[in-house]
C-alpha cells in the first residue's frame, strides 16, 4: 500500500480565498491572527462567499426592478458579479504565471500546508507521496481540450466545461 495525498491546490476556489484576503485581509497572517493557516485561508473563502452573495443580492434587486424574473435576475447577477469576475481573472493570471498572483498563491498555500501538517502530525497521519494539482493540471487540461475538440464535452457561456451524461442516466 502506498499512502498518497492528492492536494487540490489550484483553481477558482483557491483564487476566491486569495482575492478575499487581498481585498479584506489587511495583511493578516496565521501569526498575527493566532489561527492555523488552513483555518485562516478557509475564513477568507467564507468571506468571499459572504461578499459574493451580498453582491448578487444587490444586483438581483436591480435586475428585478428592471422587470426581470427572479430566475433571470439571479442568473444575470451571478454571471455579472464583479467579485466573481475578479476571481476568474485571477485564475487566468495564475495559469499565465503572473508573478504577483503566483507569489500570493505560494504564500497562502504555504499557510495551508503548515496547518495541514500540524493536523496530520496530531492524528499520526503520514504519506508516502503527495501529489499537487498545480503540478498535474496541465495534462488534465490538455485532455479536456481534446474532449472539447472531439465533441465529448461542451462549454457553457461562463467558460465551464461539461459532459452530457443524460444517456447514462446521470443528469
Model regions and ranges:
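NTP-dependent nucleotidyl-transfer catalytic core
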Residues: 1-171
Amino acid at each position: 500500500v502506498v499512502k498518497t495525498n492528492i492536494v487540490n491546490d489550484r483553481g477558482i476556489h483557491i483564487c476566491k480565498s486569495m482575492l478575499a484576503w487581498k481585498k479584506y485581509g489587511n495583511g493578516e497572517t496565521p501569526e498575527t491572527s493566532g489561527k492555523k493557516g488552513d483555518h485562516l485561508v478557509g475564513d477568507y473563502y467564507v468571506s468571499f462567499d459572504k461578499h459574493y452573495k451580498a453582491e448578487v443580492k444587490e444586483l438581483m434587486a436591480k435586475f428585478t426592478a428592471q422587470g426581470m424574473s427572479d430566475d433571470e435576475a439571479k442568473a444575470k447577477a451571478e454571471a455579472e458579479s464583479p467579485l466573481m469576475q475578479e476571481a476568474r481573472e485571477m485564475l487566468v493570471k495564475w495559469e499565465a504565471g503572473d508573478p504577483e498572483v503566483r507569489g500570493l498563491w505560494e504564500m497562502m498555500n504555504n499557510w495551508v500546508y503548515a496547518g495541514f501538517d500540524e493536523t496530520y502530525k496530531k492524528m499520526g497521519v503520514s504519506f508516502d507521496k503527495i501529489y499537487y494539482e498545480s503540478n498535474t493540471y496541465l495534462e488534465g487540461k490538455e485532455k479536456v481540450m481534446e474532449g472539447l475538440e472531439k465533441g465529448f464535452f461542451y462549454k457553457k457561456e461562463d467558460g465551464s466545461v461539461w459532459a452530457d451524461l443524460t444517456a447514462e442516466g446521470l443528469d
